Amino acid sequence: VSAAIPVGTVNDYPRFGYRGFMVDVGRHYFPVSYLKQIIDMLALHNINYFHWHLTEDQGWRIEIKKYPKLTEIGSMRPRTLIDRETQTYDETPHSGFYTQEEAKEIVKYAADRFITVIPEVDLPGHMMGALVSYPELGCTGGPYEIPCKWGVFPDVLCGGNDRALQFAKDVLNEIMDIFPSPYIHIGGDECPKVRWEKCPVCQAKIRELGLKDTPKHSKENQLQTYFMSEVGKVINDRGRKMLGWDEMLEG
């Protein structure tokens, strides 16, 4: 049997420059070995950005050396909701976090496969993992508990507290020491303002900044804009670009 293959050239390239895949390890921890398997599959499918969602209400998963309680306390929860209708829990403790060296290992493993790791630290909402560890960062001062179920929770970083703002800056500086990605994701979504509306520290900051309610934006939403802008300066000063969820624009 004889056969012939026509002479030709195949030019194959992806349609989109950004081809991303997100893994949420905040709600459920995955070991490094499993993440490497995911990265191998991403490379096989020409995905070039691995969006690593590292922090959540239900758990803080990345080592921050300046704030060791984040992983000593904030990475653990006693159980997890497994059926919303019956409110059934698995009664199994869940924990786990990545050391900075493990995170760097993932960064290199991905880079060797032409994938950039984009870290996400979601703030100022979705911060119960931080508030449990450092209650002074919240409006009420706690005590707080790690949620064992899903949803949006009223306790967030205190938007008027300079210490909470410095915490966010410190965390992101360590994140940028680990991750060379040009993009740093800071969340910005699902940040209820019920605590800020009654918090004397937040209201004092609102008055200091001269923020007023407008037909489109409450003064508390504008306080979030201030908070995110200050955080963004730290990112931009290090030559990076800030990413966030669409709700960031509500301020």
Specify the residue positions occupied by each region the protein language model found.
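Gly/Pro-rich turn-and-neighbor structural signature
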Residues: 165, 169-251
